[in-house]
Swiss-Prot record:
This is Octanoyltransferase. Pathway: Protein modification; protein lipoylation via endogenous pathway; protein N(6)-(lipoyl)lysine from octanoyl-[acyl-carrier-protein]: step 1/2. GO terms for cellular component: cytoplasm. Its EC number is 2.3.1.181. The gene is lipB.
Amino acid sequence: MSAVEWSILPGLSPYRETLEAMENRVAAIRAGEAAEAIWLLEHPPLYTAGTSARPEDLVEPERFPVHVAGRGGQYTYHGPGQRVAYVMLDLDRRGRDVRRFVTALEDWVIATLAEFNVRGERREGRVGVWVVRPDRPAGLDGSPREDKIAAIGVKLRRWVSFHGLSINLEPDLTHFEGIVPCGIREHGVTSLVDLGLPVTMQDLDAALLRTFPQHFPD
């Protein structure tokens, strides 16, 4: 099975049930019983803790439900207005290179943002995608402000990937205040709408679909 099956889920997907369904799909892919899959969805407001999450980075533990995700990375927020892409690909077939896979995810996000004339950038030592904010005050050292627009956190099970990435379209950015996103205190978060772009979720999904084959060819 080589074609990737795409699903766009309506409404808000409950986290625990979605994680269980994702784990079942990963097992089916590994067994050769199901095609690779990408699920595009939104969650209700919640925080997830990756395998490197530090207790002190959960600033407001009572604000939203907190889930242990089992993916790589630290704390992140999911909620309405944020597009989550769960990426279930067979790296045994595509190449057993985790670093290359994460880089391809970043490149996919960067290409998607470019569809809206947004320059997303990667940073050494900071997984995810960032945008420079010349419209915001510079840092104490005079360096330009950088805000995170997309987070990436993955897990592999017998070389099938799951979890994936999230892109901030129009979430309530104050919801990120309950955590230190990805353990990075000196940078903020942004979204496409925060950048002044009237992008819809349908626009974003279409861009994700268009740019995917460039970075994950069959």
